[in-house]
């Protein structure tokens, strides 16, 4: 809700939609969230989503499982070291289904298997240009 009041550009790493359409359903499907808890969660999500506006632009970085594994290894976070490949695959499938049905606003899909932002400044510049073009129609 604070984002609505902001006068400057806000960039978020995650949206409320991802938890509701990807992570929570995945936990429910894995048997790690009860049906009652999932239904309660989704009811709360619907209330929250009615109070916030969708982003001006949703940037989706589409990545293959090998790219995801590579990024996880680069980060070196201990708690991520035991993430299973089948879990990543299920999340990827849920992301793809969600993105395919996303109709709340503008969407920019970038192939993360191609881009290497931290190492390649030209890639970062290209991505920034694409974002600016979507937001402002400048390019």
Mark where each language-model region is.
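A generic structural signal for alpha->beta connector loops
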Residues: 7-8, 55, 104-106
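NTP-dependent small-molecule kinase module
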Residues: 69-139
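Conserved nucleotide-binding/hydrolysis micro-motifs of P-loop NTPases
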Residues: 16-18, 63-68, 114-117
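Conserved beta-strand scaffold positions in the cores of enzyme catalytic domains, especially
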Residues: 11, 58-60, 107-109
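A basic- and aromatic-enriched beta-loop-alpha substructure that forms the phosphate/nucleotide-
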Residues: 1-34
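Short secondary-structure boundary/capping segments
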Residues: 2, 8, 49-50, 99-100
């Amino acid at each position: 809700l604070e984002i609505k009041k902001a006068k400057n550009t806000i960039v978020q790493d995650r949206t409320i939609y991802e938890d509701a359409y990807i992570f929570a359903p995945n936990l429910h499907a894995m048997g790690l969230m009860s049906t009652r808890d999932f239904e309660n969660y989704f009811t709360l999500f619907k209330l929250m989503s009615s109070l916030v506006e969708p982003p001006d632009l949703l940037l989706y970085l589409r990545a293959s499982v090998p790219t995801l594994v590579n990024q996880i290894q680069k980060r070196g976070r201990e708690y991520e070291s035991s993430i299973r490949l089948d879990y990543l695959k299920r999340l990827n499938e849920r992301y793809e289904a969600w993105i395919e049905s996303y109709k709340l606003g503008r969407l920019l899909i970038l192939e993360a298997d191609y881009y290497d932002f931290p190492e390649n400044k030209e890639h970062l510049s290209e991505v920034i240009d694409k974002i600016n073009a979507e937001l402002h129609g400048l390019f």
